[in-house]
Design a protein with these regions (language model features):
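N-terminal signal peptide c-region/cleavage motif recognized by signal peptidases
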Residues: 15-17
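Sec-dependent signal peptide recognition
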Residues: 2-9
Length: 261
């Protein structure tokens, strides 16, 4: 990522671990989605962005929520209490949530002016990645796992949200190599893109993530985990790869249709 703006660089240094999927995950999803699109669609995308780096654009929503546009903070997640495991439009509070923000930005991509479309395509790429991160559908009382404090490998202080935002992916990079991990994600994303159809309804995707978040193996709902070891990271690595691949394919399919004109 090219950090030409000094303020952007400062924001990234001091807020990195509060980011959704961290900036690596967002850049990965959006750049790989752009690579899956047809040449005409990607050209339309880059024209809207005024850039050929969709990944950098998709990190932007996490930067602006820190200072410039704090009101967008609630747009990155949906919280739902334990026991309410099917997320519906009624789950979204008055201040907004990721579903309402996604729908608003999709409308702006279709009907907005040039500046609104530029923001919208960046928000949409970011939101689709967030939707596929299970802890973005977590509980309000612990802020989606941010207040579920734990240790990583017995010594490093962390929290449940950070484990799923980046620690699992980082573990995969360290143990398998970034090139191999990216190949697995690419192969799976291509398969999904061949087999999935256009869909602009994010509720099924949200509920996939919620089902993972409250599953027994994740240990977020019951038997809440206090120490995440390498066994946990390895076991859930395949889920992270799958969620990233789905986000890539679904974003590519969505924009193929929305930017086709």
């Amino acid at each position: 990522m090219n950090l030409k703006n000094p303020l952007l660089a400062v924001c990234l240094v001091f807020t990195f671990e509060g980011y959704s999927w961290w900036d690596e995950g967002h850049s990965l999803v959006c750049n790989k989605a752009a690579n899956l699109m047809s040449a005409d669609t990607s050209a339309n995308l880059f024209s809207i962005l005024e850039s050929d780096d969709y990944g950098e654009g998709c990190v932007w929503p996490d930067v602006i929520k820190q200072v410039e546009r704090r009101e967008t903070g609630p747009w990155h997640y949906i919280n739902s209490p334990p026991g309410k495991d099917v997320i519906t439009p009624d789950s979204c509070p008055e201040k907004g949530c990721i579903m309402s923000a996604y729908e608003e930005q999709l409308s702006l991509l279709r009907t907005g002016n040039d500046a609104e479309k530029k923001d919208a395509v960046r928000f949409i790429g970011h939101f689709i990645a967030d939707i596929h991160q299970p802890l973005h559908t977590g509980f309000g009382y612990d802020r989606g796992g941010n207040d579920h404090l734990l240790k990583l490998n017995g010594n490093k202080k962390s929290n449940m949200h950070s484990i799923w935002d980046g620690e699992i992916l980082d573990f995969l990079y360290k143990t398998h190599g970034k090139k191999d991990v990216h190949k697995k994600i690419d192969d799976l994303a291509k398969k999904y893109k061949r087999n999935l159809n256009y869909n602009d309804d994010v509720y099924p995707w949200i509920n996939e993530s919620r089902k993972i978040a409250v599953s027994d193996s994740v240990r977020y709902l019951d038997n809440r985990i206090q120490n995440v070891d390498e066994g946990y990271l390895k076991t859930h690595g395949s889920i992270v790869i799958d969620r990233l691949a789905l986000a890539i394919a679904r974003l590519a399919i969505l924009l193929e249709v929305e930017l086709s004109g």
